[in-house]
């Protein structure tokens, strides 16, 4: 199982939100690349990077910071937020981003996602509120069940699904293991858990399923409730 530390970018700074609300943003660093460098030094191989401004604007908004992170680390980067067309995908691939996360567009235009997955390294972000898919930076809820959307991308060439329980995101209330497993089973695709991770027990629970491919760690690191180096050791030895 892979642990992916997270950096959310807002106005060029590293922040965390609670339940996806922009007004809840708490700034953790004015220099996100330094945070990424620290993750690398702690033993991380991947970075989960989100352009929050981009998610709401529908186009890249933190390019300079993304370039800085790419230039200063050798981490593999998966990036989401405002990626709605092939031009943006190509721009990020040219920057050296390893994997791109398509979210809202996966609900509106799954055929586009499948076409992109045939050409580029694509992950689908499935964000859910009470089991139903949330779109537009979590500002709206759709009538589609998260498991149905996951099933849509089975055998599509999509590399991974990142599933977020929006109600838990940034709350440190514990990860939703059952939801993550349901997405993995519905899709047959490597599934990465996101939202609510608090401490090492969450990592152990996910690892024990044997079906979860990865977990994103955000606020638990920034608030000190999870020892990231301990978590890396656990998954490497497990």
Swiss-Prot record:
Top EC class, one word:
isomerase
Tell me what reaction this enzyme catalyses: 1-(5-phospho-beta-D-ribosyl)-5-[(5-phospho-beta-D-ribosylamino)methylideneamino]imidazole-4-carboxamide = 5-[(5-phospho-1-deoxy-D-ribulos-1-ylimino)methylamino]-1-(5-phospho-beta-D-ribosyl)imidazole-4-carboxamide
Entry's Gene Ontology molecular function annotations = 1-(5-phosphoribosyl)-5-[(5-phosphoribosylamino)methylideneamino]imidazole-4-carboxamide isomerase activity
Q: Which GO terms describe its biological process?
A: L-histidine biosynthetic process; L-tryptophan biosynthetic process
Which keywords has UniProt assigned to this entry? Amino-acid biosynthesis, Cytoplasm, Histidine biosynthesis, Isomerase
Q: What is its main location?
A: cytoplasm
> What are the record's GO terms for cellular component?
cytoplasm
Q: Which InterPro entries match?
A: Aldolase_TIM, His_biosynth, HisA_bact_arch, Isoase_HisA-like, Isoase_HisA-like_bact, RibuloseP-bd_barrel
Protein EC: 5.3.1.16
* UniProt cross-references to Pfam families, sorted A to Z: His_biosynth
Q: Where in the cell is it found?
A: Cytoplasm
Catalytic residues (UniProt): 8 (proton acceptor), 127 (proton donor)
Q: In which pathway does this enzyme or protein participate?
A: Amino-acid biosynthesis; L-histidine biosynthesis; L-histidine from 5-phospho-alpha-D-ribose 1-diphosphate: step 4/9
CDD domains documented for this protein: HisA (cd04732)
The UniProt entry's sequence similarity note says: Belongs to the HisA/HisF family.
HAMAP family in alphabetical order: HisA (MF_01014)
Protein's recorded name = 1-(5-phosphoribosyl)-5-[(5-phosphoribosylamino)methylideneamino] imidazole-4-carboxamide isomerase
Q: Which organism is it from?
A: Nitratiruptor sp. (strain SB155-2)
């Amino acid at each position: 199982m892979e642990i992916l530390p997270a950096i959310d970018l807002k106005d060029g700074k590293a922040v965390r939100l609670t339940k996806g609300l922009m007004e809840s943003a708490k700034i953790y660093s004015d220099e996100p690349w330094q945070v990424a460098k620290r993750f690398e030094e702690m033993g991380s191989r991947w970075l989960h990077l989100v352009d929050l401004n981009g998610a709401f604007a529908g186009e890249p908004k933190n390019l300079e910071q993304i370039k800085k992170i790419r230039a200063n680390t050798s981490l593999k980067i998966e990036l989401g937020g405002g990626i709605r067309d092939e031009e943006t995908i190509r721009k990020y691939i040219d920057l050296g981003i390893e994997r791109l996360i398509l979210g809202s567009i996966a609900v509106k235009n799954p055929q586009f996602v499948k076409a992109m997955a045939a050409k580029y390294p694509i992950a689908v972000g499935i964000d859910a509120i009470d089991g139903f898919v949330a779109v537009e930076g979590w500002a709206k809820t759709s009538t589609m069940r998260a498991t149905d959307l996951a099933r849509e991308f089975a055998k599509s060439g999509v590399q991974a699904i990142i599933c977020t329980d929006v109600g838990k995101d940034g709350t440190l209330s514990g990860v939703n293991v059952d939801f993550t497993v349901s997405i993995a089973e519905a899709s047959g695709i490597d599934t990465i858990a996101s939202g609510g991770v608090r401490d090492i027990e969450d990592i152990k629970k996910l690892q024990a399923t044997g079906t979860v491919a990865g977990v994103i760690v955000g606020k638990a690191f920034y608030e000190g409730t999870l020892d990231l180096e301990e978590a890396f050791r656990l998954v490497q030895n497990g």
